[in-house]
Amino acid sequence: MGKRIIVAGGGHGGIAAAALLAEQSFDVTVYERNRREDMGYDWTDIFDKNGLFACGMEMPPKEKYRLKNDMTFIAPSRTAKIKQHVPEEQLEIQMERKDIYDHIIEFAEHCGVKFRFETEVKAPVMLGGRVAGIRTKDETVYADLVIDAAGINSPVRKNLPDCLGIQKETDKYDTFHVYRAFYNKTATVEGDKYRVYLLFDGKQQICWVADDEEYTDVLIGRFTPLTDEEVEETLTKLRELNDDLGTERLRGGQYVTIPVRQPLGVLVADGYAAIGDSAFMTVPMIGSGIANSFKAARMLANAIFADDKELYSAETLWSYQREFYKKLGNGLAPLAVIKLMIASFSPNDLDYCFEKNILNSDDMTIGADTNSINCFIKKMMNFDSLRTKTVGVMSEPEMSKKIFAMVTRISAVMAVTRAMPVRYDRRAVNLWVKQYNKCFKVD
């Protein structure tokens, strides 16, 4: 052991993988552009606590987390709403982002991970077709393996040679541009504490207004970048509907881009493995990926431990790719197709889904294990619910076309993911990933 591993970027999954490896005597260093005190956005996040257990971490102190509130989804016309009812055992935990980072960095340092903060990774070092290290502003650092945890716009992934078959850029509807802030709370909320507005104000956007003990949490998200003027206009309209949303911003106010797409088609190359947002491991419907990244960290560590010749090649790392897709990716990828269909909906389309009960509380009940198309299929197996959905869909020809196209595309995605090569062969993998990526193309 003792091989040198670099984690490029301080993503959650990368730090978790670093901890597991350092614990087994690997020499692991995380290179992160931010200062230690700036790790984590100034807001809260929700995730499945089982992700912590997957990579050997304990629960944080009780005062550092709480269970999330059920969400109420409001139709574009605001004439109908659906409230989810997540069973208590499926409730995700909600934590401050900075507290999440405190928890995992402390764990990683205890395991022996070294951190280089305020050190931005600029590009990979390539030796032929192998990733052999990273370049920063001031130095070139070599390693036996580079774990890419540098996020959605990773400079490592974006600068890999095309011959590796690893997608560099995102496509239309792959990313969500988000503004999030916390404002003073100006009224007590007795009813729906977590209000999610779908296609709010007739625009292709999602907004939420969530009651907290000390403030009101606001999110505005679109597939296109937001301007300050658009945010202020939307906030004004949200305040007209929500008495608890004040005008004094207490925290947050950042603009962030998050991935809401299928997982990266190829996760590995010689000397390289992608994880977390670098590999688009979020749930496409909601953009949450912390737990998936933690679970992937365990899978990656297992693949590295199994490489007794310490080659860290695409061939030996392919077991990580296979395990990730078997346990997570095969279920996440079809959800990206559902997201693409919803992205094509007009406000009238979505209102129709509410009105005809094509969407119901079960569909919107997203719990800790809702990270697979199979979760939604199981919910639809209720005969009465399925009959209601079928009648509603078949009664509207344009809706029928969209649903049929979605089902056809989901079937194609499931067939392609099942056909993933069992062993790594660059030519076979490149042919496969072209078919995989093609499943998600939009005009």
Task: Identify the role of each PLM range.
Residues 1-11:
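Beta1/beta-strand and adjacent pyrophosphate-binding region of the FAD-binding site
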Residues 8, 22-41:
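Glycine-rich FAD pyrophosphate-binding loop
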Residues 14-15:
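N-terminal Rossmann-fold NAD(P) dinucleotide-binding loop
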Residues 35-75:
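N-terminal FAD cofactor-binding segment of flavoenzymes
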Residues 78-97, 133, 212-224:
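Helix-loop-beta segment of a Rossmann-like dinucleotide-binding subdomain
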Residues 107-243, 280:
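Predominantly flavin-linked oxidoreductase catalytic cores and closely associated redox partners
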Residues 121, 226-304, 308-322, 326-330, ...:
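FAD/FMN-dependent oxidoreductases across multiple families
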Residues 305-443:
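C-terminal helical "tail/cap" subdomain of flavin- and related membrane-associated enzymes
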